[in-house]
């Protein structure tokens, strides 16, 4: 009793619940320790009850002493205990006895509920305080739009994450039964955060749409002229967007800015108006695209720039390569103007290799830009056809090499060939087919058969190939060298075909070995030819046209300008791809090459397009591509008659693939029905039946989708395997001027096969097709610099000097051992550039590096690699001198006069 009595005198503010708890338990123990004989005594019973009640009360007192107790909770306690008392928030001198007198142990469950509610409410209260503190400090991040003072707003990534987390927290608080006291405040925060989220989304969409449309509507006179109402509408939107963005930025605080009165409704209205402008612009551009379908493959910004500057053709020239794939620019007549004060286009410049081709006749750039760009395209095709008709005649009148190197008359007799490279290849292909078929006619001649005609044809082709190889060893300009190298590639393939037919004893042109080859012909088309009435202006006087026959497919040559670039080395695998692909096109289907990476799926498709002179666009598919973009591509392909090669098509998401089935089926059905117009995505467009679609796939790779069955049925599959590297090496060596190409190709392939198997597995090692091509280019350079040196030595030097920079030290012994085995007794010295090495030495001294021989060699090797590579990795352990290596080379180049900057 003394303990309880003394406890009652303790001030509530100074009460220590732990001490009380320990003291009360000691009292209980002391009472229990009394002798059993006193337990029947009334005093014992009273003391025992008092101590137990006190023990049961102490935990409740601890709960009531918590900081979470507010006046509302003390008032609730008064109601539960039905006793009136002055709570501690009113009476700072309240004693513990005042609380003990409430007999809390009799209401323990109610007291615990009150205290639990107080604790939960405190948690909500603290969360609200944290929300206020956090959102009072969150401000906008800003980038200025182009060179203006218009702010483009965004939130920091961590602030956006806080927004999402806080929205979930507020939802959780509203779901709590303890939120009643804070209901209005929490609901207000829910509204605030929802506004922040909505406004943030609107700001992102508005900024994206506005910044896309602003240069088009404000900066494009064409849009203002063609869409006056929408241009006026956008002017108002432009003012509103800038005002709202500047206001939000001036407020700084995200919460305050996003919760301005009426802001959300104003943003909704702005977004609606922007969508109207965007739709009008899209409809306008689609109208222009329908007039000149190649505009489907240009971005809207580029297209509007073209349309805006259409009356000034000089300003449109920078977009030439986006409209005509292999054309860099047009040459305009600076002296004479048309009746509309426009220039004439007199020639075009190749974007692939080096070549200029003069229009026949020159083209007046009159009218709307979409009209005269179509006229330019037609004029290109007509010019190529005119060149073909002359080239076919000239081929019969000159020796082959004279015809090949024949130049135009003044003013550029030394630069421009009389025929574009594309026409030279076409003429060669036409005459090769004619010569082989003439050999077959000689074999089967009824009165005077010549069974050796095909062998004689082979001998003639071998000599022609040797002549071309010898021609590469003479001094040629870049344009002529490229042309001759491509001719060698084509001639080598032609020779291999005739060798195969001789080996198989082929005696007739109807044999499959011959029918399965791409055969270029210049003749009057037979009745079973495809598109027999197409392009009557591209016919000879007797109705002849250039066409390609393979098996039962006969298609016209399309005269798309290809430039003066390299062509693919054709292997037996390529021939099989050509047969399947052309059969698919003949059946009005698409084609689907599938196989591992690096096997030539895309390149074979592009080369087939080159053989047929078709415009071929390559699209890299990704999961981000949507059905609208894909629909525009199909519209462009269908109406322009172009080919589309969709790389890694199975990376598209299943939803897009499903829509693609409908889109491409509309094209296929239109081609089969010989329709002049088709409907894709509710748009009616013209249909050119020579269009084609190719999809390449890497089966079994991660992240790939399964094609819908309906889509599979529209494409003919082709399985593509690893190409014949030996044959590719042989052809490329011949093109570089090597006469012992067959032997050297076998050694080359053997070396790379052994290196792949025997050297350590390093991430930077590459013994594939790309590495092969790079070494052959180096070997060709050595051959031209030292034509009298043994060819084995030249190739060995290229293999050694190109590969040794990337070989790690532990592999060097194996590498040199294999080189020695394949090229015994051959060890040509490294090609030295004394001038470069002197500049490297001076650069080392200027940078404070010790110019030892090994370091200087690495710098020189880096320079040699950069001559044939766009990018080089400099690898090695820390402190090996990687940075100093490239810095020294940059300094050496600057000393040499080639100013080199680095960042």
Describe every region a protein language model picked out.
Residues 1-557, 565:
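Extended amphipathic alpha-helical elements
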Residues 420, 427-431, 435-438, 446-447, ...:
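Alpha-helical lid/collar subdomain of P-loop NTPases
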Residues 573-574, 582-588, 853-855, 862-869, ...:
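Phosphate-binding P-loop
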Residues 586-618, 635-636, 871-902:
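Walker A/P-loop
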Residues 625-646, 679-686, 863:
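Conserved alpha-helical scaffold flanking the Walker A/P-loop in AAA+ ATPase domains
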Residues 635, 650-687, 692, 698-701, ...:
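Conserved catalytic/switch belt of AAA+ P-loop NTPases
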């Amino acid at each position: 009793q003394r303990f309880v009595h003394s406890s009652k005198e303790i001030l509530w503010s100074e009460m220590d619940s732990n001490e009380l708890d320990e003291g009360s338990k000691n009292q209980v123990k002391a009472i229990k320790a009394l002798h059993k004989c006193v337990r029947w005594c009334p005093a014992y019973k009273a003391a025992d009850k008092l101590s137990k009640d006190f023990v049961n009360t102490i935990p409740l007192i601890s709960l009531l002493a918590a900081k979470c107790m507010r006046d509302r909770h003390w008032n609730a306690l008064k109601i539960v205990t039905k006793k009136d008392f002055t709570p501690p928030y009113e009476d700072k001198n309240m004693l513990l006895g005042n609380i003990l007198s409430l007999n809390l142990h009799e209401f323990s469950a109610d007291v615990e509920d009150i205290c639990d509610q107080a604790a939960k409410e405190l948690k909500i209260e603290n969360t609200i305080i944290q929300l206020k503190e956090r959102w009072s400090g969150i401000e906008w991040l800003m980038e200025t739009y182009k060179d203006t003072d218009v702010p483009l707003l965004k939130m920091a990534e961590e602030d956006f994450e806080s927004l999402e987390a806080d929205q979930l927290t507020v939802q959780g608080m509203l779901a709590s039964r303890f939120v009643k006291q804070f209901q209005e405040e929490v609901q207000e925060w829910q509204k605030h955060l929802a506004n922040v989220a909505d406004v943030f989304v609107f700001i992102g969409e508005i900024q994206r749409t506005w910044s896309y449309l602003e240069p088009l509507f404000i900066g494009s006179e064409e849009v203002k002229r063609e869409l006056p109402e929408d241009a006026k509408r956008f002017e108002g939107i432009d003012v509103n967007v800038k005002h709202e963005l500047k206001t939000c930025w001036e407020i700084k605080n995200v919460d305050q800015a996003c919760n301005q009165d009426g802001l959300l409704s104003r943003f909704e209205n702005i977004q609606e108006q922007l969508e109207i402008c965007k739709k009008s612009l899209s409809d306008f551009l689609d109208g222009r695209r329908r007039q000149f379908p190649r505009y489907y493959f240009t971005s809207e910004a580029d297209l509007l720039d073209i349309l805006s500057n259409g009356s000034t053709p000089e300003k449109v020239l920078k977009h030439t390569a986006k409209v005509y794939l292999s054309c860099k620019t047009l040459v305009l007549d600076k002296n004479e103007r048309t009746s509309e004060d426009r220039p004439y286009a007199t020639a075009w410049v190749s974007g692939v290799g080096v070549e200029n081709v003069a229009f026949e006749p020159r083209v007046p750039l009159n009218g709307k830009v979409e009209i005269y760009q179509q006229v330019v395209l037609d004029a290109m095709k007509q010019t190529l056809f005119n060149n073909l008709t002359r080239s076919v005649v000239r081929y019969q009148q000159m020796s082959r090499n004279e015809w090949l190197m024949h130049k135009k008359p003044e003013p550029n007799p030394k630069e421009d060939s009389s025929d574009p490279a594309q026409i030279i290849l076409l003429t060669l292909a036409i005459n090769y087919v004619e010569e082989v078929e003439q050999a077959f006619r000689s074999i089967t001649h009824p009165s005077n058969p010549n069974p050796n005609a095909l062998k004689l044809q082979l001998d003639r082709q071998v000599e022609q190939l040797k002549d071309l190889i010898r021609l590469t060893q003479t001094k040629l300009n870049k344009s002529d060298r490229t042309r001759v190298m491509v001719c060698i590639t084509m001639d080598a393939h032609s020779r291999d075909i005739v060798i195969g037919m001789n080996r198989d004893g082929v005696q007739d042109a109807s044999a499959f070995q011959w029918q399965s080859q791409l055969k270029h012909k210049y003749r009057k088309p037979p009745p079973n030819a495809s598109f027999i009435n197409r392009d009557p202006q591209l016919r000879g006087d007797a109705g002849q046209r250039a066409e390609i026959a393979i098996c039962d497919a006969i298609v016209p040559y399309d005269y798309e300008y290809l430039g003066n670039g390299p062509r693919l080395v054709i292997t037996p695998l390529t021939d099989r791809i050509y047969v399947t692909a052309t059969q698919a096109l003949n059946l009005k289907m698409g084609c689907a090459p599938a196989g591992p990476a690096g096997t030539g799926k895309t390149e074979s498709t592009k080369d087939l397009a080159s053989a047929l002179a078709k415009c071929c666009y390559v699209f890299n598919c990704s999961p981000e591509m949507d059905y609208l973009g894909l629909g525009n591509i199909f519209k462009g392909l269908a109406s322009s008659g172009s080919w589309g090669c969709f790389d890694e098509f199975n990376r598209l998401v299943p939803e897009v693939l499903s829509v693609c089935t409908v889109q491409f089926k509309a094209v296929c059905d239109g081609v089969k029905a010989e329709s002049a117009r088709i409907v894709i995505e509710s748009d009616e467009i013209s249909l050119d039946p020579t269009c084609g679609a190719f999809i390449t796939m890497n089966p079994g790779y991660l992240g790939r989708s399964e094609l819908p069955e309906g889509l599979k049925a529209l494409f003919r599959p082709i399985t593509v395997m690893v190409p014949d590297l030996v044959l590719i090496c042989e052809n490329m060596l011949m093109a570089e001027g090597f006469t012992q190409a067959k032997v050297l190709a076998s050694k080359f392939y053997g070396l790379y096969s052994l290196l792949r198997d025997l050297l350590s597995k390093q991430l930077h090692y590459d013994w594939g097709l790309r590495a092969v091509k790079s070494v052959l280019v180096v070997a060709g350079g050595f051959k031209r610099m030292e034509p009298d040196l043994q060819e084995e030595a030249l190739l060995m030097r290229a293999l050694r000097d190109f590969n040794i920079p990337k070989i790690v030290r532990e592999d060097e012994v194996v590498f040199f051992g294999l080189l020695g085995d394949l090229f015994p007794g051959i060890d040509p010295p490294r090609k030295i550039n004394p001038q470069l090495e002197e500049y490297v030495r001076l650069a080392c001294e200027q940078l404070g590096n010790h110019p030892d021989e090994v370091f200087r060699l690495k710098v020189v090797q880096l320079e040699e690699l950069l001559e044939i590579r766009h990018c080089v990795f400099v690898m090695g352990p820390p402190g090996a001198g990687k940075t100093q290596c490239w810095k020294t080379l940059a300094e050496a180049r600057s000393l040499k006069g080639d100013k080199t900057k680095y960042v």
